[in-house]
Amino acid sequence: MVEKKLTGYPSVDKPWLKYYTDEAINAKIPECTIYQNIYNHNKDYPNDAALLFFEKKISYRQLFAEVEKVEKAFIAQGVKRGDNVALCVPATPEAIYTILALNKIGANANMLNPTFTEQQLTDRINETEASVMFVVNELYSRVEKIIPNTCIKTVITCAAVNSLGPIVKLIKKAKNIPNTLSWGKFLASGRNASTSADVSYQENVPAIMVYSSGTTGASKGIQLTNNSINATITQYEYTGFKLARQDRYFAQIPIWFSTGICVTMLVPLCLGVTVILEPIYDFEIFYQHISKYKPNFMVTAVGLVDYLRNKKEIDPAYKEFKYLVIGGEYVVPHAESVFNEWLKKNGSESQLHKGYGMCECGGTITSTNAVSNKFGTAGIPMAQVVVSAFDLETGEELTYGNRGELRVLSPCKMSGYYKHPEATAKYFKTDEQGRTWACTGDMGYVEEDGNVYVDGRISDSYVNDQGETIYLFDIERAILDVESVRQCKTVVSEIDGKQTHVAHAVFFNNKSTEEIIARIKAVCKAKLPENHYPHLIKLHEDALPVSPSGKLNTVEMKQDTENIIRVE
């Protein structure tokens, strides 16, 4: 067969397709609701474990039965197709029942981020016009004061440990919250209600809404549909991830993020993989549960992988990892080698994998896999996804190896920002061929072999006193080229009354701090313009701080200006 000649443009050549089968490339996205997709995949396996909540296994038979109870209860509360329902919940069984029940009805699950300010929560709730909210008791204090100022009429509450039975609830002293509808009474209200089995599938109906962080402006609702989430499921089903029925998926990313609810929850749940629910974001608890339940799949950050290595370098559980994926940050090649050696020592046949994504694109854009796992990359586009770089000034597509804004064609993309048409129009750009590109705001490039390299956010920059635009990720990459540096993130902080860049770093303990800093100076002088030098370095002992989303906590780092080392 004659090899196809490359044009030089990734969107035309799609060189990553050589890593995929025809089945993956041409896989049909199911035209049904998310619930129907999950049901169709698992109706013949009623005894398989769908969820694992601490030590309690929940079968698909029980899952579907509970979803029907919750569906009837919401119908009794007046929830109907097209309604928005606010959820302020971590990953508990009741949260999953609720999301799927609302999907059966045709309602939209609005996943509120409990770390939002009271004003953010108030604004986001009111713009949805939701009359019903579901919140776990443990997060009720986050919304208690704002509820009178919102459109919410009915508040359903439930202890996070509700599914663990009466003895555990007694030990945890779970109490009903006054002036709310307890979970038990909520379910009781629907006993005589009929289900919504006659609700037919419609294309691009809103299904789940997550929210942007709001760190660079007002948070916005990111509207995902049945089609977009089913497309995400399809990408994972056919693209070589080897998700085998009754494998175990460690779901530690909060479900109010797209990656948390779509990639680490609905994808494995649909494909018959048992989801290990983790309602509390705590590294020590994560280690205990990984050691105990021995998951095969996990998407996480460098910080947790480092924690596991340092906590207990050798553990029988680590051998079971088929796909240990780091997303949301660059993994330096020498650190990747260390992680691979660690997995090998534990008897795992897998290597560390990397991925890149964003909420607006359903969670995953690129990923490494069994046939393509190159050091330093964010992987290749998923089988039905296209990625290319575009010139920041002209908006023209760039050829291989040229850096620009990464833009994405994906069936997993959001339908838009909720009630923000201007922001939606800015995010999506339609080209002359009628293709709608998602403009990620990330700087990067694509190589001839199909691998995607992500440098960082274009906005991750500032203008210095000399009027120069300094991209912080360029400083990070230079520092990370020093093999004794394990992690690095550069942020802008106010130091001595002016804005300047500070490099936050974690070192391997193979050399003295003085030796490593001297090496950083030498490497940065060879690779960076003088005004880009990292003259201020903040060292962290174990790992850089991580936010509940699993991403690096840049807000905390910007505020942390104590004990900074000045490098002349």
Q: What residue ranges belong to the model's regions?
A:
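Conserved AMP-binding/adenylate-forming core of the ANL superfamily
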Residues: 30, 47-92, 96-100, 117-122, ...
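Conserved structural elements of the adenylate-forming
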Residues: 64-69, 222-244, 252, 305, ...
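AMP-binding/adenylate-forming catalytic core of the ANL superfamily
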Residues: 95, 116, 133, 410, ...
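Conserved pre-ATP/AMP-binding loop-to-beta segment of ANL
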Residues: 175-211, 218, 241-248
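Conserved AMP-binding/adenylation subdomain of ANL enzymes
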Residues: 230-248, 257-299, 307, 311-312
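Gly/Ser/Thr-rich phosphate-binding loop
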Residues: 296-300, 309-374, 386
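Conserved ATP/PPi-binding loop(s) of AMP-dependent carboxylate-activating enzymes
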Residues: 380-384, 396-429, 451, 468-470
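Conserved C-terminal "lid"/linker of ANL adenylate-forming enzymes
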Residues: 489-494, 502-504, 521-568
